[in-house]
Regions:
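Short coil turns and loop connectors of transmembrane beta-barrels in diderm outer membranes
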Residues: 18, 34, 83, 127-133, ...
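Short glycine/proline- and aromatic-enriched beta-strand/turn motifs that initiate or cap beta-hairpins
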Residues: 21-77, 146, 217
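Cleavable N-terminal export/targeting peptides
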Residues: 1-34
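Outer-membrane beta-barrel translocator domains and adjoining extracellular loop/strand segments
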Residues: 50-57, 99-106, 145-154, 191-198
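Predominantly the C-terminal beta-signal and adjacent terminal strand-loop region
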Residues: 51, 96, 100, 174-218
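Contiguous, function-dense segments enriched for cysteine-driven chemistry
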Residues: 94, 112-119, 124-126, 158-164, ...
Length: 218
């Protein structure tokens, strides 16, 4: 996880928001029923997948899957159903390199863009103060597009649904502005076929989605 990158991005986002904050002298107030928070984030999506790559007959090839990290900007849209319950959807896309590794082999086989929308229902226990922690649960859909095969391999990835858990917090700054820290864990598995099924893998992507950013309440 590129933690240093995320921290530096959060500092940059806060600096970018500073002029707007200077024009918002009012104290930050907890969001209430009917409010929106739109959050711009820097997000690191990383998977620890290391599933085996097998032959069409199911024999172990000696290779495993490796999926690269990706840090990209994302947007979060949160609507408050009540003072304590909110629905969040995230919008963003990330690019990942897929490698086959094992023994002396370490080769890139595919690079793909992923659209991984996540929708969660959040519970927020606090209604006063500047610190608004939350937990949530929801669903995810992994959509792969604009894939590029590498080094003579042909890779097909199946889209699939998954589910997610979430924890995070909004920290009030002033006026409608807040800092946001958010962590999601997504559980999703996909089928990957290599060279028209000559090789295959059931890949447990199960990515972590770690974000920092600045939000505005409407």
């Amino acid at each position: 996880m590129k933690l240093k990158t995320l921290i530096l991005s959060a500092v940059a986002a806060a600096a970018f928001a500073a002029p707007a904050l200077a024009q918002s002298p009012a104290a930050w107030e907890m969001p209430k029923k009917g409010d929106w928070i739109i959050t711009g984030r820097v997000t690191d999506v990383f998977s620890e997948a290391d599933n085996a790559i097998t032959t069409a007959a199911g024999a172990d090839s000696g290779l495993k899957v490796d999926v690269g990290d990706s840090v990209m900007p994302t947007l979060g849209f949160t609507y408050f159903l009540t003072d304590h319950l909110a629905v969040e959807a995230i919008l963003g896309t990330t690019k990942h390199e897929i490698r086959a590794q094992g023994g002396a082999t370490d080769v890139a086989v595919h690079e793909t863009w992923v659209l991984p929308p996540v929708v969660t229902l959040q519970y927020r226990p606090l209604t006063e103060g500047r610190f608004s922690p939350y937990v949530g649960a929801g669903v995810n859909y992994m959509l792969f597009y604009s894939g590029e095969d590498k080094n003579g391999f042909k890779v097909d990835l199946d889209d699939n649904f998954g589910y997610a858990l979430q924890a995070g917090a909004d920290i009030g700054i002033q006026g409608p502005w807040n800092l946001n820290v958010d962590v999601k864990k997504v559980w999703v598995s996909i089928d990957a076929d290599v060279n028209d099924g000559a090789l295959k893998s059931d890949v447990d992507l199960d990515p972590w989605v770690v974000s920092v950013g600045v939000g505005r309440k409407f």
